[in-house]
Amino acid sequence: MTTASDAVVVGGGPVGAFAAWNLSKLGVDVTVFEEHAEVGVPSHCAGHLSIRGLKTLGLDNLPRGIVENTYSGANVYSAQGTKFSLRMRKPVTCAVNRALFDKFLIERAKKTGASVSLNSRVKSLVVKNGFVVGVSLDQKSKGENQSEAKVVVDCEGISSRLVRQAEPAALSSQELVYGVEAEVENIENVVSDEVGVYLGKDYAPGFYAWLMPRHDGSAKVGLAATRGNPKELFQRFLSKHPVASKQLSKAKVTQMTFHAISLGGPIRKTCANGFLVVGDAASQVKPTTGGGVIFGLTCARIASEVVAEAVRRKDFSSVCLEQYEDSCRSSLGFDFRTMLRARRFIYSLSDKKIDSALRFSSRFKLDEAMKGVDEIDLQGQMLVKALSKPALFAGLAYFLLLYLTTNP
């Protein structure tokens, strides 16, 4: 059996759902294929999103129950337990229930005309005369078949199977960390509107651990690392970290998931004839924090506009679709490059140097200089603005001094 649409979206996660929603609003006949029986399950993301980012995307008035908490502060802890605290003037980030958030987006896509097919695993791209013209499917209710499309929008996530088929050289920039996230009850000594960030090569080498509290004493707790077994690192973090071990001494883990995160910045090529890749599959993920939802949604909106124009012009060549790549690079390229350099710099420092940096930041009251910050997604642009403040400029100079000195 063969079906046909203007566009096929592979993956019903937030990026795929948002792409389909925007495509259908622009009059494009679109079908979403989601391999799972239910959208949003299983969840592979903490759901820690910037409030400003959501507002920019028109998602600031989410239905009741999706937003689990908002955060006005953050505490960064070194491996030795030194704390640097930030307190903003208003909530800057929020925690969303990812299952409900994903369902909200897919329902909006359906209401604007998108078709959604669950239990539908896309096996491969269908290619004719150098153009992607559809997908080959394995559907639980219908067996194996194909769906024709003028454009395939790949939002399948980090597995990137289809990217390898369409543009095998595109993935060379991927840098992966491997993470674990848990739902935890009975946390202690935590302010409910402040997130925790925990550094240390014995607990999360090459990345960090996090704690996102809720008002009821539960939290999302996780970590990611470039090496080591995530589950073993997580147990060590719970029991040995000088701060987290006290906050989580009575904690009960009720659920645990494992996932990889791509931190190398966007892949080199995000389009081919009849094909676009968006979100985690394109590594459109913040290299500093591993957050990919806001950037993925931003790129999904750009992709939908480019695809709608391609449908109008009846031109599905890579030359036409490259407008998507150019627009994403123009909007986010500087921030990606800045964040990638910042991550490599920070994680090149020893635990002792990071501890010294946090002590310096507290001593020179860098928290006061950062109180007005509300932009956490476009971190390159945020850094440029920050350099106009003497205290933050001094802080950056100190970090550079740490990097250049040879003493551990």
Language model features with spans:
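Beta1/beta-strand and adjacent pyrophosphate-binding region of the FAD-binding site
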Residues: 1-15
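Conserved hydrophobic helix-helix packing surfaces used for dimerization/oligomerization
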Residues: 7-9, 30, 275
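Conserved Rossmann-like nucleotide-cofactor binding loop
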Residues: 15, 38, 159
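A conserved beta-strand/loop capping segment in the N-terminal third of enzymes
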Residues: 50-104
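Predominantly flavin-linked oxidoreductase catalytic cores and closely associated redox partners
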Residues: 108-248, 283
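FAD/FMN-dependent oxidoreductases across multiple families
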Residues: 124, 229-306, 312, 318, ...
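C-terminal helical "tail/cap" subdomain of flavin- and related membrane-associated enzymes
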Residues: 308-408
